Swiss-Prot record:
Comp. bias regions, Basic and acidic residues: 618-630, 879-897, 914-929, 943-961, 1272-1285
Coiled-coil region: 178-260, 374-403, 724-750, 803-827, 868-897
Basic residues composition bias: residue spans: 1292-1310
Positions with biased composition (Pro residues): 902-913
Record's function text: Required for correct axoneme development in spermatozoa. Important for normal development of the manchette and sperm head morphology. Essential for male fertility. Plays a role in localization of the intraflagellar transport protein IFT20 to the manchette, suggesting function as an adapter for dynein-mediated protein transport during spermatogenesis. Also plays a role in bone growth where it seems to be required for normal osteoblast differentiation.
Protein name per UniProt: Sperm flagellar protein 2
Renumbered residue ranges of the record's region Disordered: 618-658, 879-1002, 1272-1322, 1793-1812
Disorder association: Defects in SPEF2 are a cause of immotile short-tail sperm defects, an autosomal recessive disease only found in the Finnish Yorkshire pig population. It specifically affects the axoneme structure of sperm flagella, whereas cilia in other tissues appear unaffected. Sperm flagella are short and malformed, with disorganized mitochondria and loss or disorganization of the outer fibrous sheath.
One family name in Pfam for this protein: CH_2
SUPFAM superfamilies cross-referenced by the UniProt entry: EF-hand, P-loop containing nucleoside triphosphate hydrolases
Lineage: Eukaryota, Metazoa, Chordata, Craniata, Vertebrata
Subunit organization: Interacts (via C-terminus) with IFT20. Interacts with DYNC1I2.
Annotated keywords: Cell projection, Cilium, Coiled coil, Cytoplasm, Differentiation, Flagellum, Golgi apparatus, Spermatogenesis
Interaction with IFT20 as annotated region, ranges: 1317-1669
């Protein structure tokens, strides 16, 4: 029950405090939870005044408020119950809650609230309850003590507890003191006893010493004393005894000899006789006699032996006595002799003896003392050993704990690192997921904007932002950008730059949005302008300072360089020491190098000694190393760089003070020190300041140490570098290359430049690595910690115990410091390694994988062997590489020697006549000493010869193999004499066929590299950067505006669509007219519905309504069309196209500006190369006009950029054109005509602008060519008139031949007179020089014009591409706008048609209802374009539905109705509440009810014909004994038909009742009764009649279940309770009385009781008894039927008996249970086996007591059912007991109905059929 209550409180009601069975009493002691329960059932309105406190006033308040509510519910509650609950008496709260649970469930079923319950109470009861409540409150206040009293009681109780504890403590202390006192007394007593014992022992020793010192001198005895005489007598006796003994021995020896002789003779005779008489009969012999004799002889021999022993013992005693006598005699003689000495001698003897005793005592004392000393020393030594062992053990424990703590700390740090890494990865994943969500939402947004057609450009931009990890949505606005932008604005700037760069790359490379359209696919894009690239990069190289590059060594070094890395205790130093034994290598440890550097500083290591050592090393090492110079140079750089931060404080102080003399001397002395000493000084200075040595200083120390190693000797670094910065600095210091700078150069080369260097190689060469190998000894963190612990343990165990204590303490302190430092640093070292190793691993593996990983978690020997094998393999690799390089160099040298021999000898160049030429001749010789690397000259020479190595190296990978060895790498000046060697002679030999000359800008073309003035690069390089930046920024800005404009267009078109849709959906007033018409229609009187005139009027009203609605639709259509025209006539499309055209014109302007700037740069460059003055170009650049967006009149001088007004074509002129409009398909829409005309005008403006820009470019190129020709004419006027075939041949071009010829003719005509006048003599050298200059000028002109033509083609191509893209962009924009306008028109038309159709539908519905003369009850809904009849809204209410009458039970076949049964029950209950009534009274009551039935309807009609005899017969069927009738059994039988239960159903019902009855009271309430249920339920298949006026069928079984509760319940209790066991005993009745008894026993015991096997006899007896008792002897047919039924039951019993289990009927049954089953009357009867009446209860009890005693239960304990059923009395009682037999009262009724009828069936058989 407690579990049910807890579940109800916690799960169903969910009270504020969780209740458990253990805390039930405590939880409800305050009354708060009871109030909360009542409040949840809306019975406690003042719950807010309840208190959760546990003080007395709170409890009193709570229970005072609870009392009226509990009494209202009918719960028994008074002050005693409240007091028990408050004092937490067990079970009281649970009982109250159970009653409350029942009452609340009953209240819940009734559905009444608390107020209704109060109003239902009489007024008197309410007043009385108020008075009771006041009295309850007073009594409860008296019972509950005040809180102050409770608090005082608690305080006093607490102090009493404290007093009790203190008293106990005092008693314990007193007992302890007493025990200590007794212990002290006991110790004192034992000490006194020991002291007395020692004193007594000491006294005894002294007395013994005194006694020993005293010498007693005996007196001399006379010979004639009595003692001497006795001794003489004894001697005589001894002698006699010895003589007798000797004689006896002799006699015995003789006798033994005789006996032995006789025995041997008898044995021989007996043997012979035995052999002869073996076969004879065994006759009488004298063996017994002989045996007796032998036995006597044996006894005599044994007696003799005993006597001999006694004799021998006696003789021995005599001999001993004799020897003692002789000894005493000798002592007496000695004493007598001593007695003869003098008294003085005796005194001396006593003194000597005393002295000897004293010496012995002293000696013994000394020995004892030494022994004590030795024991003490041993004890001290053992204590010291134990102390050291304990200390060692404790140290070992501490060490293990420390190691465990270190490991835990490491695991914690590792876990933190893992957690940090997890958080980092999680944040990255979360960020990526957020970006994915942003991308998804952005795509979804734009799918809505673009009707699921997202432009490719937008998606491409979003993907770029997503791949670069930037937010897709705008973080902040960039319109108002402050000086210090916020983080969000910086992110937006980064996004904008990224998209700008991507757009620019697409524009430059003509991919993506700027890919070539279909009409331009056949046009090949122009290639890069190689001439311009060469010019730009030559200018940049001239502007940069000269670089001194290191030269590669002639012979490669075989010395190996490497480093060994790993965690702490990974075995690096051990492995390197092992390698140093077998290989000539140097091991460099950074710690050792730093210490040596500091030590060198302390030792004042000077430069002189180091220089001598260096010279000696240089003399020994003949080959010059390249690395030494680089290292020293880098080292000096490091020193200078390191010196600056260290001397900052000094320089700051020097501003305030003048330097002292000491500081000057110190700085001078520091400069005299060696490099190592200087580095040591700086290191020490940093360490003294508490700082760590910087990476730069560490690298300097390492590089300095490496410089001191001979070149032929290899070196390995031990554990260095440890960080990526150290690795970078070390590589830069050792190789001279900075990998970051190289990567930056590579990135710079990849940056989008406008000019590409044709000679520069695209691949960046890999820098040489500082190491040949890097070896990692990989171990785990735990291994490192374990090795540290092992090393410390070994150091701890290796301490020697015999060393000096001072040295030992100092060494221990030092070791402890080192160990502590090691312990403190091991975690940081491991963490540092993990922090820096990933970057180091990437550094050593990316360009060239030189990293070797090795598992170092092996023993030392295996590790050293592995390292040795790896090192040998690396040495072999190094040697192979060095041999390969040397072979390659030798092959190159051979090629160099073979090439000069193959080339023909060139004639010597003419001697320079001017001093400038002498200057030009010197730089090649100087440069030849230091050849350049990477194809870049160190400094640009003033002549073209410097370009030769550049050409040769830069074109190796690009040119074909045929041109690989050509000598065209020489300068053009050197080529001219070779080609024109025959020009010396006047006779010109015929020239053989020469291949056509190469075109400028091709791969075979050799660029003109004539010297240029120094001012030209200084001016042109910034000018070119300005050109590039302005071009790139202009392109990016325009593309950005185009990109942002696309977003604006999409948003505007979407807003236009949605706005127009909302405009179409604006509300109208059609529904008001429809509602008004419907109200008027429904208000028409009923008598006018069929009138024809009325119908005509209604039709006319419908027509008026339709016309009015059509007018509304037409007006809305006109408004929508006007709205569409307003949207079309807006200037948005025109403004958008104008802005887009201006953007594309800006792109054309950028291309035009770039071309003009490039033309100007090339002109200045080549004029500078020709040593001409640059022209002053005062002409302004060409400007492309932009489109004027507004029509405001502005003055020309106010405009920075020229504007073109927009002119649209008139529609009249446009209609005359036969052109088919591509945008307007199908029917002509005149509203869109203006759009098409504007588009054609814009298209024409774009075409005109493009043609204008293209013509401007062509004119500029033509002007430049014309200017060149004019300059040539001016230069050739003073020249000679002789022909210059080389220049003419080099300058021939198809387009320019006619003007050249004309100008030459003009030149010839105009120059003939001067030639004739001046005819100086010209030498051959001057002619050759002039020819060379003319050829150079011609090459410059060709290269310049070729570069211009390249730029012209590229610009024209770009302009055409921009024009095509602009037209496509404008067409796409106009198409999108026109699509939207057409969509608006489509929506408008569809909506108008839908509205008209809905009006038609409304009209049809209205006409239908007019014709059918019916009202329209549901609302007609006409809104926008939708029309429907709203079934949820009715304009007038429905008529109320008919009420179904309640079900009524009808009489059927004489069965009593439930109402009749209840009436009978009430009458019988008033007369006989106990359930038993007299036989006569019962018959009289029934007779009165039958005869006096005046409209009461107590019985059905079939019962109304019963006579008194029939009623008496009916009573006799129900009689218990001769006089009593059980009226409950009568009503149970009268209520038939109901399903008779089987035994299993009865037991199951009993178990359900027991489960519901948690308190096991044996009774249940009505709610529990319904919850448990019976074996049958109400009829669930009741058919509900279709007619609502017809009542529902009566469910008799459901009402019977409720009637059975009313029949058997005890109504005296409140609420009524039902004894379910007693009820089931009634239901155990059966047509077979014996079967009914067994069923009742089963119900009483709670389990199935099996019948015994004696069935046939029992059945016969049963039938006879039944026949005897049956009152229907006149009707034999029912009796025969019943007998046959009994046979069937017998067969069923036999079947059941076969299935009886072995352990059947083992249940225990008590005396009370047996009496409950066999309940009888009060009439005593005789008891014998043949009595047909049941005995009374008193007689049953006596008989049952006797039965129990007979069966062995003396004290009436319960016995087994099987044992009880074997008793004959019980068997007789079961056979004869009729109370459990169902009487067949229908026989009486049938007889009364059919007095003469004989065709009715008997009731027993019908009952049996119903059961089956």
């Amino acid at each position: 029950m407690s579990e049910i209550l807890c579940h109800w409180l916690n799960q169903e009601l969910k009270v504020s405090q969780t209740v458990s069975p253990k805390s039930f009493a405590k939880a409800f002691s305050s009354g708060y939870l009871i109030g909360e329960v009542l409040h949840k059932y809306e019975l406690q309105d003042d719950f807010a005044e309840f208190s959760e406190k546990r003080i007395s006033s709170a409890k009193l308040n709570n229970f005072s408020r609870l009392e009226p509510t509990l009494h209202l519910l009918g719960v028994q509650f008074d002050q005693n119950v409240a007091h028990d609950i408050i004092t937490e008496k067990p079970g009281v709260a649970m009982k109250l809650l159970y009653q409350l649970y029942i009452a609340l469930q009953r209240k819940k079923k009734s559905g009444l609230t608390g107020v209704e319950l109060q109003t239902m109470q009489p007024l008197t009861n309410t007043k009385l309850q108020n008075m009771k409540s006041e009295a309850f409150r007073d009594r409860l206040r008296n019972l509950i003590p005040r809180q102050t009293d409770v608090s005082l009681m608690r305080v006093s109780h607490r102090f009493q507890e404290k007093y009790k504890y203190k008293d106990e403590d005092l008693v314990h202390t007193h007992l302890k003191k007493l025990e200590n006192f007794q212990k002290l007394q006991e110790e004192q007593r034992s000490f006194n006893i020991e002291k007395q014992r020692l004193s007594r022992r000491r006294q005894n020793e002294i007395m013994a010493q005194i006694q020993a010192a005293i010498i007693q001198i005996p007196k001399p005895a006379s010979n004639r004393t009595l003692k001497a005489l006795d001794a003489q007598k004894m001697m005589k006796k001894k002698k006699e005894a010895e003589d007798v003994a000797n004689e006896i021995k002799k006699f015995e020896a003789l006798i033994k000899k005789d006996l032995q002789a006789k025995e041997s003779a008898s044995k021989t005779s007996l043997d012979a006789a035995g052999q002869t008489t073996t076969d004879l009969l065994n006759t009488y012999s004298d063996d017994e006699y002989i045996k007796k004799i032998q036995k006597r002889l044996e006894e005599d021999a044994f007696a003799r032996e005993q006597r001999e022993k006694r004799r021998r013992r006696l003789l021995m005693d005599q001999l001993i006595a004799h020897e003692a006598q002789e000894e005493a005699y000798r002592e007496e003689q000695l004493v007598s002799r001593l007695m003869r000495q003098s008294q003085q001698e005796r005194r001396i003897a006593v003194q000597l003896m005393h002295v000897r005793h004293e010496k012995e005592v002293l000696w013994q004392n000394r020995i004892f003392r030494e022994k004590q000393y030795e024991e003490r020393r041993l004890k001290d030594f053992q204590d010291a050993l134990d102390r050291e062992a304990a200390l060692a053990k404790q140290a070992k424990i501490d060490y293990e704990e420390q190691a465990l703590r270190e490991k835990e700390m490491h695991e914690q740090i590792a876990a933190e690192r893992v957690q940090a890494r997890y958080k980092k990865h999680y944040s990255i994943c979360a960020e990526i997921l957020d970006q994915i969500l942003d991308l998804s939402t952005k795509v979804a947004d734009y799918r809505m904007l673009t009707n699921n057609l997202i432009p490719y450009k937008l998606m491409h931009d979003w993907k770029e932002l997503f791949f670069n990890g930037m937010p897709i949505y705008e973080q902040a606005s960039l319109k108002h950008l402050s000086a210090k932008p916020s983080t969000e604005q910086l992110i937006e700037l980064e996004k904008r730059d990224l998209l700008d760069n991507n757009d620019y790359e697409e524009y430059k490379n003509m991919v993506g949005e700027w890919a070539l359209p279909e009409e331009m696919v056949d046009n090949i894009p122009p290639s890069d302008n190689r001439i311009l690239g060469h010019v730009i990069h030559r200018l940049i190289e001239h502007s940069l300072p000269p670089q001194v590059e290191s030269t590669a060594p002639e012979l490669p070094s075989f010395a190996i360089k490497g480093c060994l890395l790993g965690k702490t205790f990974s075995g690096k130093t051990t492995a390197l020491k092992f390698l140093q034994k077998y290989f000539p290598i140097e091991v460099l440890s950074i710690d050792t190098l730093v210490q040596e550097a500091i030590q060198a500083f302390h030792n004042n290591e000077k430069v002189s000694g180091a220089l001598q050592l260096q010279k000696a090393a240089e003399e020994k090492a003949s080959p010059v190393r390249q690395e030494s110079g680089d290292r020293s140079q880098n080292l000096h750089n490091v020193l200078s760089a390191e010196g600056t931060p260290e001397t900052e404080d000094e320089t700051r102080l020097s501003t305030k003070k003048t330097p002292k003399a000491e500081e000057v001397i110190a700085s001078a002395s520091l400069s005299e020190l060696t490099t190592r000493a200087q580095l040591g000084a700086k290191s020490e200075k940093l360490l003294k300041k508490g700082k760590s040595i910087s990476d730069t200083l560490l690298v300097s120390i390492v590089v300095n140490a490496i410089n001191q190693i001979p070149i032929y000797k290899g070196w390995i670094l031990d554990g260095f570098p440890m960080t990526l910065n150290q690795a970078k600095l070390l590589e830069e210091a050792l190789t001279g290359f900075n990998r970051n700078l190289i990567e930056l150069e590579g990135k710079k080369s990849q940056i989008s430049t406008l000019a590409v260097d044709p000679t520069a190689s695209r691949e960046v060469p890999l820098p040489p690595s500082a190491f040949d190998f890097v070896m990692l000894l990989d171990i785990s963190d735990n291994t490192s910690l374990n090795r540290m612990n092992d090393i410390m343990a070994e150091a701890f165990l290796s301490e020697t115990p015999h060393e000096n204590i001072n040295q030992r303490v100092a060494a221990e302190n030092q070791d402890m410091d080192e160990d502590q430092n090691l312990r403190d640093q091991i975690q940081h070292r491991i963490i540092g390694f993990w922090d820096h190793w990933p970057s180091l691993e990437q550094w050593f593996t990316e360009p060239e994988n030189i990293l070797i990983k090795m598992n170092a978690e092996v023993d030392e020997q295996s590790l050293c062997q592995k390292v040795k094998e790896m090192f040998m393999a690396e040495i072999m690799k190094k040697e192979n590489k060095a041999k390969k390089k040397s072979e390659e160099k030798e092959a190159e040298k051979k090629e160099e020697f073979s090439l000069p021999e193959a080339t023909p000898p060139t004639p010597p160049a003419p001697p320079p006549s001017e001093p400038e030429k002498e200057k030009e001749a010197h730089p090649p010789h100087e440069r030849s000493k230091t050849p350049t690397a990477k194809g870049k000259p160190a400094s640009e020479p003033p002549h073209g010869n410097r370009e030769s190595p550049q050409e040769g190296k830069g074109k190796k990978s690009e040119t074909s193999p045929k041109r690989k060895g050509s000598p065209r790498g020489k300068s053009p000046g050197g080529k001219a004499p070779v080609k024109k060697s025959p020009a010396d002679s006047t006779d010109v030999s015929p020239v053989p066929a020469v291949p056509p000359p190469s075109k400028p800008g091709s791969e075979e073309w050799v660029f003109v590299n004539e010297p240029i003035p120094e001012e030209i690069p200084l001016f042109l390089v910034p000018y070119w950067k300005l050109i590039e930046n302005s071009y790139i920024n202009s392109i990016k800005t325009v593309l950005r505006h185009l990109r942002e404009g696309q977003h604006t267009v999409l948003a505007y078109l979407y807003d236009t669509r949605t706005g127009f849709q909302q405009f179409l959906r604006r509300p109208d007033h059609k529904q008001n007219f429809v509602s008004q018409w419907q109200a008027d229609f429904n208000s028409l009187p009923d008598d006018l519905w069929e009138d024809e005139e009325t119908k005509a009027e209604l039709h006319q009203r419908v027509n008026d309504l339709r016309d009015r609605l059509w007018d509304i639709c037409d007006a809305r259509k006109e408004e929508a069309e006007q709205e569409r025209l307003d949207i079309i006539n807006e200037s948005w499309l025109q403004d958008s196209t104008g802005i887009a055209m201006n953007h594309f014109f800006s792109l054309m302007q950028a291309e035009l500006n770039r071309f003009q700037d490039t033309k100007r740069l090339l002109q200045d460059y080549y004029r500078g190369m020709e040593c001409k003055i640059p022209t002053d170009d005062t002409k302004r650049f060409t400007r492309i006009p932009l489109v004027q967006l507004d029509n405001k009149d502005t003055l020309e001088f106010q405009l920075r950029i020229p504007l073109v007004p927009r002119r649209s074509i008139s529609p009249e002129s446009a209609l005359s054109k036969p052109k088919i409009k591509a945008l307007l398909k199908g029917n002509i829409d005149y509203s869109l005509e203006n759009v098409e005309l504007n588009f054609e005008a814009d298209e024409k403006v774009v075409m005109d602008t493009w043609q204008q820009a293209s013509l401007a470019v062509s004119h500029m190129v033509a002007a430049e060519i014309h200017q060149r020709l004019m300059e040539e004419e001016k230069e050739n006027q003073p020249a000679d008139t002789k022909e210059k075939p080389p220049q003419a041949a080099a300058n021939k071009k198809v387009k320019k031949e006619p003007p050249k010829k004309k100008r030459e003719d003009k030149k010839g005509k105009g120059k003939s007179p001067p030639m004739a006048e001046s005819a100086p003599v010209i030498t051959v050298e001057e002619i050759a020089e002039m020819e060379r200059k003319n050829e150079l000028r011609l090459r410059i002109k060709e290269e310049h014009l070729a570069a211009l033509q390249f730029e012209e083609r590229a610009t024209q191509f770009r302009l055409e591409l921009i024009k095509t893209k602009a037209l496509a962009f404008l067409e796409d924009l106009v198409t999108k706008a026109v699509d939207v306008y057409k969509l608006m028109e489509k929506w408008l038309g569809e909506r108008y048609l839908n509205e008209m159709a809905s009006v038609e539908k409304l009209t049809e519905v209205a006409r239908y209802h007019i014709e059918t003369s019916t009202k329209i009850q549901n609302e007609l809904y006409l809104d926008q374009e939708d029309f429907f009849i709203n079934g949820n809204i009715k304009v007038f209410p429905d008529p109320p539905p008919p009420v179904r009458p309640p079900p009524v039970e009808k009489e059927e076949n004489g069965t009593l109705t439930i109402e009749q049964l209840d009436n009978l029950r009430d009458q019988f209950l008033d007369i006989a509440p106990k359930g038993v009534i007299g036989n006569k009274a019962f018959a009289d009551i029934l007779l009165d009810l039958v005869t006096l039935n005046l409209g009461t309807n107590n019985f059905p009609s079939s019962w109304m014909h019963l006579t008194q005899p029939e009623l008496q017969e009916l009573a006799s069927l129900l009689v218990i004994n001769s006089e009593l009738v059980d009226w409950r059994k009568f009503l149970l039988v009268a209520a038939l038909p109901w399903p008779i239960p089987l035994e299993e159903e009865l037991l199951e019902t009993l178990q359900r009742f027991k489960a519901v009855d948690e308190e096991q009271l044996g009774t249940v309430t009505f709610e529990q009764y319904l919850q448990a249920g019976l074996w049958f339920t109400g009829d669930k298949d009741i058919k509900i009649p279709a007619n609502p006026l017809e009542p529902l069928p009566f469910n008799r079984q459901e009402h019977l279940i409720e009637f059975f509760f009313r029949l058997f319940a005890d109504h005296d209790k409140d609420p009524p309770r039902l004894d379910y066991t007693e009820m089931l005993l009634y239901f155990a009745c059966h047509p077979d009385g014996m079967e009914g008894v067994y069923r009742a026993l089963s119900v009483a015991t709670g389990s199935h009781v099996f019948q015994p096997i004696e069935t046939p006899v029992l059945v016969a007896e049963k039938t006879s008894s039944f026949i005897d008792m049956s009152p229907t002897e006149e009707y034999p047919e029912p009796e025969d039927n019943f007998i046959s039924e009994e046979r069937e039951l017998q067969e069923e019993g036999e079947e059941k008996e076969e299935d009886i289990p072995e352990n059947a009927n083992t249940e225990m049954i008590s005396m009370e249970t047996l009496l409950k089953v066999f309940r009888g009357g009060n009439e005593p009867q005789d008891t014998n086996r043949f009595a047909s009446y049941p005995k009374t209860e008193s007689i049953y009890s006596e008989n049952f007591i006797k039965v129990f005693q007979d069966l062995g239960s003396k004290n009436l304990e319960p016995i087994e059912v099987a044992v009880l059923l074997k008793h004959p009395f019980i068997q007789d009682l079961i056979r004869s007991y009729p109370d459990y037999k169902i009487p067949d009262i229908k026989v009486v009724l049938q007889r009364s109905e059919h007095i003469q009828g004989s065709d009715g069936e008997s009731s027993p058989s019908r009952l049996t059929e119903e059961k089956k």
